[in-house]
Amino acid sequence: MAIMAPRTLLLLLSGALALTQTWAGSHSMRYFSTSVSRPGRGEPRFIAVGYVDDTQFVRFDSDAASQRMEPRTPWMEQEGPEYWDRETRSVKAHAQTNRVDLGTLRGYYNQSDGGSHTIQRMFGCDVGPDGRFLRGYEQHAYDGKDYIALNEDLRSWTAADMAAQITQRKWEAAGAAEQDRAYLEGLCVESLRRYLENGKETLQRTDAPKTHMTHHPVSDHEATLRCWALGFYPAEITLTWQRDGEDQTQDTELVETRPAGDGTFQKWAAVVVPSGKEQRYTCHVQHEGLPEPLTLRWELSSQPTIPIVGIIAGLVLLGAVITGAVVAAVMWRRRNSDRKGGSYSQAASNDSAQGSDVSLTACKV
């Protein structure tokens, strides 16, 4: 079965880079797929996206006119027609498996045919600065909840409930973990190395955050200080507030890191402070693009470099253009990417000999 996202890929490359290639830090490749049933309105919708680090590089949408796996970055456009034909065949096969799994899982959970249900899947691998394998992932979810996941040892499964144990027994009998491990430690790593080389100008860059602070009166006695970080890459960043040098984590409102729409990211952290005491508070920003951490303090003469109204309007527009399905898939990805167990439907690499990134085909649940 393949994993589904709350109501809302797979790639394999045959090229390999020499192990002498090194990068600044660790890197990851992730594929996320979501199938959503829609009773009375035709076949389930299937969306698959692939990420190298924080950059989406491929996408498939069964509702799109092209019905093809498509590049999402310029450096993927160098792949030839045979590559895209192979990836499209593989991702369509995965979509078909999910259609079957949706019916199977309804039976496992004794659900009626009338409601809409989802399957999500996330899989991928991480490499270290030397390009060598660090860890692999394979997770599945049903209706937004963990279903089954490949354990950190890549040899066994964790099932979330009695229904998932049925799938676990099937996959253990089929040797699914061994197939996944071979892909994750082999072709997944080779593909990631190749993408890092082909897209190095984008993937291996660091853009330092542009920072500023805004002040928003809450009442006659309190105000909100908001610390902004804009235009940074990669997405990993730390924003913290201190009062007189003491950490204010519990009193901090912190939003998830958000894509800016131009390949960079934005984030803010806010605290409510007594009016007139603003200068006791400092915001601390850490990011690999900075030579050293930044410390910001509100001054009465401070003016935001970007009007807050414009930023909020931009974020609203960004939310409007991103489809709900992909947003849900990404949210599920971030929630699960650092966990060794989640949900997932096993993929048997029927096409792995041909080097298809999507050849980690989902086994039926």
UniProtKB/Swiss-Prot annotation:
Residue spans, topological domain Extracellular: 25-308
CDD domains attached to this UniProt entry: IgC1_MHC_I_alpha3
Topological domain spans for side Cytoplasmic: 333-365
GO molecular function list: peptide antigen binding; signaling receptor binding
Modified residues (Phosphotyrosine): Y344
Topology in membrane: Single-pass type I membrane protein
Pfam families: C1-set, MHC_I, MHC_I_C
Residues with glycosylation annotation: N110
InterPro entries per record: Ig-like_dom (IPR007110), Ig-like_dom_sf (IPR036179), Ig-like_fold (IPR013783), Ig/MHC_CS (IPR003006), Ig_C1-set (IPR003597), MHC_class-I_related (IPR050208), MHC_I-like_Ag-recog (IPR011161), MHC_I-like_Ag-recog_sf (IPR037055)
Region described as Alpha-3: spans on this chain: 207-298
UniProt KW keywords: Disulfide bond, Glycoprotein, Immunity, Membrane, MHC I, Phosphoprotein, Signal, Transmembrane, Transmembrane helix
Signal peptide (UniProt feature, chain positions): 1-24
Residue spans of biased composition, Polar residues class: 343-359
Disulfide bonds: C125-C188, C227-C283
Places the protein is found: Membrane
Quaternary organization: Heterodimer of an alpha chain and a beta chain (beta-2-microglobulin).
Family as reported in the entry's similarity comment: Belongs to the MHC class I family.
Name of the protein in question: Popy Class I histocompatibility antigen, A-1 alpha chain
Organism classification: Eukaryota, Metazoa, Chordata, Craniata, Vertebrata
